Amino acid sequence: VSREVPVSVYETDITEWKKHGELAAFLKETGYTHVEFHPVMEYLDQNSGGYSTSSYFALTNRFGTPADFRALVEELHQEGIGVILDWTPAQFPRFDAGLEKFDGTPLYEVQDPAMAVHPMWGTMLYNYGSPMVKDFLLSNAFFWLDEFHVDGFRLDDVDAMLYLDFGREAGQWRPNLYGSNENLQAVEFLKHLNSIVKKRNPGVLLIAQEDGLWPQLTDSVENDHLGFDYKWSGGWTKDLLSYIEVEPLERKDYYDQLTLSMMYAYSEHYVLTLGRRDVGTLKEFLEKLPGSPKQKLAQVRAAYAYLMLHPGVKMTAPDKECTEEMKAYIHDLNAMYRSCPALYAMDGNSDGFEWIQFTNYDENIVAFLRKTEKMEETLLIVCNFSPVSYDSYQVGVPFAGKYKEIFNSDNGKYGGLGVVNTRAKNAVHAECDNRENSLKMKLPAYGVTVFSCTPEKKVSSVKRVGKKVKISRK
């Protein structure tokens, strides 16, 4: 799949959508490109949320029939929405009718009893060195691709596959033949999985949920790496939440959490998430934030906007029962993301991002540019995470020209206070942020504003010199 296209994923549990056409209508109204379903394979443990798969080739009976699910996928495809499934090839549950000692011997699980059971979850770990196990998991991936025409997988707990010591204390694990903690058999399985899926089903998205800092996980198999398309950026989510959940007066001490992600943003191709597993429902997200109800909502809008404007693929999960104002907000964020190449075309290239303000600790403001190779597609973005509103906030700009606000999270139609910039502004020749030109704008409290940038047209000196002058001979 090309990484130069916008990808905005809606995370949800399929049980929340019971009426025909309801999910497709919601996704179309809010502007998402993809939906990611929590596991749809059969499971027994209700408390697992589906992540303890018991029958890999069966749709859970909680969701209706296979024909129903197939029809749902087709309905979403007709609206141009891709379908991604959460998939659990890292471990399987222990129960009498399951895969554990399927024929009386350790057939699917790791042969070594000390390494077969994961101490954190009490589940069994697959033996990726077994050709039968590899074929079982590969055939399962192709089953969902071929039978239901899904468009990708998010692999859960990839770090439990890659690291022999994941979640284990010293003495609870055995090193590989080189004396290190990498599961070499799992590494080869993932390389094979990613390469064969992409060869057989071009365009399928393969996303890894991995927090163990495996190097270059999204680099190609040809370069001897794992070949995933994207990796969840758990660090980005953790850093942002650790910043916005503290009281505004204390945020200056956590300001670096806002900017830290750009130190590693181009080491992988990331998915940025503010989903159910990160913040819970919208109500639960609001409860985590300081301030009045209005201020809490403003901060949620600012967090969503910061995610959408930061380099990386997007994944959010606003409630299906969210207000019309929030629906309009998500729609406009997605519409801007999809229509502005600067927000996606150079996601994997550091030339597509440039800081303007990233040391405003006391003000809790960051400003940056998103760019393409075309100067006229540049976007100026200013994010204010403080309760202070500004009537004339100055920021340095990349060049002389006209700047027009195309998005403001404080717009009244989103439930904001309406601190917006209604007229286009011309940059002035006044130094700011070590730049020759600057701009003064209204900047709302807990607000994010985005300006399009039109360079000043310069009159060609060649044309002036070559201008014909009519000389009077009188």
At which residue positions do the language-model features occur?
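Carbohydrate-interacting/catalytic domains
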Residues: 1-10, 15-31, 297, 308-474
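Generic enzyme active-site microenvironment
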Residues: 9-11, 84, 154, 207-208, ...
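Substrate-binding/active-site clefts of carbohydrate-active enzymes
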Residues: 4, 13-182
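Conserved alpha/beta catalytic core and glycan-binding cleft of carbohydrate-active enzymes
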Residues: 149-151, 166-318, 338-410, 417-418
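Active-site/binding-pocket entry motifs
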Residues: 15, 43, 277-280, 412
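Alpha-helical packing segments of well-folded alpha/beta enzyme cores
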Residues: 23, 68, 72, 133, ...
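Soluble or luminal CAZymes and related metallo-dependent hydrolases
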Residues: 18-19, 65-68, 132-137, 182-189, ...
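Core domains of carbohydrate- and sulfate-ester-processing enzymes
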Residues: 1, 79, 98-111, 246-262, ...
